[in-house]
Each structure stands twice: as structure tokens, then as C-alpha cells.
Amino acid sequence: MLEIVYQDEYFVAVNKPAGMLVHRSWLDKHETQFVMQTLRDQIGQHVFPLHRLDRPTSGVLVFALSSEVASQVMPMFAGQEMSKTYHAIVRGWIEEEGELDYALKVELDKIADKFASQEKEAQDAITLYKPLAKVEVPYSTSKFPTTRYGLMELKPKTGRKHQLRRHMAHLRHPIVGDTTHGDGKHNKLFREEFDAPRLLLHASELRFVHPYTQQEVVIRAEVDKVWQQLFERFEWPSTLLTASH
């Protein structure tokens, strides 16, 4: 059963579990569980994805309840009219909030994009970032006896593929658990010492003006047990995830 965090006659939103694909893909033929099909069976009607979340990312994922709504609303979700808030645990400490304006080249998939042009220009990509908490753990990943990590609030202003993961890696503060853009030493430490074997990136909140009622919609999704036990270990108050809204 998926946790439904919002529903009206036009939309339904779930708290996507980490590791679950949004829909069937020929690249992952062995997979049997998908958010789209599970949700369809759960509510008894077809659903139409309005945006994407990478497979390892958890959090708010919104679907339209008809193809007509999907086609009308999709441009809004693709544009700047959505306010998205993510939380991530990253390597090292970032002391001040800021804005990263750093263009990203289109990431091509080795299989799916085999025949796509390799020469596409970089696309504008902007992310707002804000440090919320920090911790120093008594484990070494380098010449120092301890290692530092930080909790970040991230707000993408554009929607490029793997934007937050790539932007944090560009800042030399990769998201813990990122096997593509991250640092294997830190991923291993979290896997072995903190029982956190995956990407620590969560889509906490989505805000938009409802296109049919003109009311502001705020959809929030709680973090799962992996995050909760990390907050306990690091002595971070859970209110950090809602205080900045």
C-alpha cells in the first residue's frame, strides 16, 4: 500500500518509497513493482504522472486522474510554477545558504540514448541550498579521525536530470548514497555504520496554485525509518524538516 498524501477530483499524490520505479521500463525488465500500477490498483482508476522522481529518491509524487488534466497541467509542472523542497544529507559542512547557477549537460543513458546526439549544449540549471544542521561522526574516511556531514534544504528552480545530485557534487558536497555522482567512501560508511544503504535525498514538499480552484496546494511527505534513525543518531530534531517551510 502506498501512502496517499493528497487527493482531490483532479490529482492524487503519494509518498514514493525509495527504490521504487515510477512506471514500467524496458531498462528494468526484472522489476515487478511500480508506483503507477500499484496506485492504480489501490484507488481503482488510471493515473498519469505529472513529473518524475529518480528511483532512489523518496517523497512527494503527483499524478493526474485523467489524461485531459495531465495534458493541461504538465507544462506547469515542467516550468517554474512549482515550488519543490527537498532534503538531503551531504558530505562536509556548508556554512551559508546560497544559489548555484551551473549549467548541466544532458545526461545520456548508455542504453536508452545510444543513438542520441552526444553534442547537446548544456542547459541552465539553478538550485537554492540552505544548511539546516551538521554532525561530526567518530569514523574516518580520510587522514582525519572524524568525518563531517550536513543536512541541507534544496530547492531546484529548474528540472534537469539528476540536478540536485550533480549540483551538490559540483559543490564538492555530494549527497550521501549517490552511487553515480557521489563518493563511495561515504556511501560505505553510512551503509556499514548507520544502516543507511541508499541515496539520502527526499522530496519533502510541493507547492502550486491549483489550476482549477486557484487555491494554493501544499503537499508534504514524511521521511522514512532510515532517515528517522539517522536523525536520532545525529541528535537532530525532526522539526528541522518542517521549520523552514
From Swiss-Prot:
Question: Is Isomerase among the key words of this record?
Answer: yes
Q: Which PROSITE patterns match?
A: PSI_RLU
The record's section on NCBIfam families has: PRK11112.1 (NF008321)
Recite the UniProt keywords alphabetically: Isomerase, tRNA processing
Q: What enzyme category does the UniProt record give?
A: isomerase
- Kindly identify the residues recorded as the active site: 54
Q: Name one Pfam family in it.
A: PseudoU_synth_2
**Role played:** Responsible for synthesis of pseudouridine from uracil-65 in transfer RNAs.
Q: Does the keyword rRNA-binding apply?
A: no
List GO molecular-function terms, semicolon-separated. RNA binding; tRNA pseudouridine(65) synthase activity
**Catalyzed reactions per annotation:** uridine(65) in tRNA = pseudouridine(65) in tRNA
| Top-level taxonomic group | Bacteria
One GO biological-process annotation of the entry reads: tRNA processing
The similarity comment for this entry is:
Belongs to the pseudouridine synthase RluA family.
Q: What is its EC number?
A: 5.4.99.26
Protein name listed in UniProt: tRNA pseudouridine synthase C
